[in-house]
């Protein structure tokens, strides 16, 4: 079978080295004669895995000692409700910065639990761009300020951290977590579904500052209560052990290849290579301002929906999978998360050049 490159927005590709290791020990994990999927989540070997996974994650992401890591379920959508249930306090309201589909969806869910103010920070003119990120003059009115630093659908990324003064900043990093080095101390809570850069779907990572745990409203279900999950080591219920195991392999692999310093350089090169070609092309166009172009999700169009559909069909046949844009926006989208290689990007560009030659209007 010829090589296939998977540009899916999520669940996304996982490092081949990680998948190979998982395959090698699938039915005989740690020479126990059983799969990791078959052992007790509270047994000696799995608890050692959990401890090592957290240690590796903390090292790779440089997580401060006064932050806890929780491995939960429910995806980012679950956190859309969990955040207000745990963080709304005396001020009784939160501020949501709307940069696109997912930040708007988070705000809509949060309104079921609290008073939510929403400010649009994206301009959709000839080019899509992020506006002012200084909210220090109003942030202290709110229990927290929420934003999504990478919008997968539109391919918009916010590289600067919003200025919220001393307010609690909450970030949905589902699509750019572990893609570059960040200062975690600037955030109160970071959360992310696993299925883009952490591992397979099923695990939701929450990184939360210690002082923000223990303030949940009394009717919060125990499974969504950060304090309960902290005290139970994220095991108030039986966790998705295989997903946790694969995440542990990803963290270890990131360490082995040099950490986020290396990953950040690789990601920047992949994205720049693809954007440079799109900008030089006479057929394709990206509508996001250069300073806000996503490193993870590269969107592009031909300007002709029928030609877009033809591109998707022919690229799929050529072994370039999942390039169809989100139904909300259309066009094409190449998701080039951590596990995507430079070779994959070069293969995509090679196909794009061929398609342009064959389909550019005369």
From Swiss-Prot:
Entry's localization field: Cytoplasm
Binding site for L-glutamate: 42
Pathway info: Amino-acid biosynthesis; L-serine biosynthesis; L-serine from 3-phospho-D-glycerate: step 2/3; Cofactor biosynthesis; pyridoxine 5'-phosphate biosynthesis; pyridoxine 5'-phosphate from D-erythrose 4-phosphate: step 3/5
Gene Ontology terms, MF aspect: O-phospho-L-serine:2-oxoglutarate aminotransferase activity; pyridoxal phosphate binding
PROSITE patterns in the record: AA_TRANSFER_CLASS_5
Metal-binding recorded as keyword: no
Uppermost EC category: transferase
Gene Ontology CC: cytoplasm
Cofactor: pyridoxal 5'-phosphate
Protein name: Phosphoserine aminotransferase
Organism per entry: Haemophilus influenzae (strain ATCC 51907 / DSM 11121 / KW20 / Rd)
The encoding gene: serC
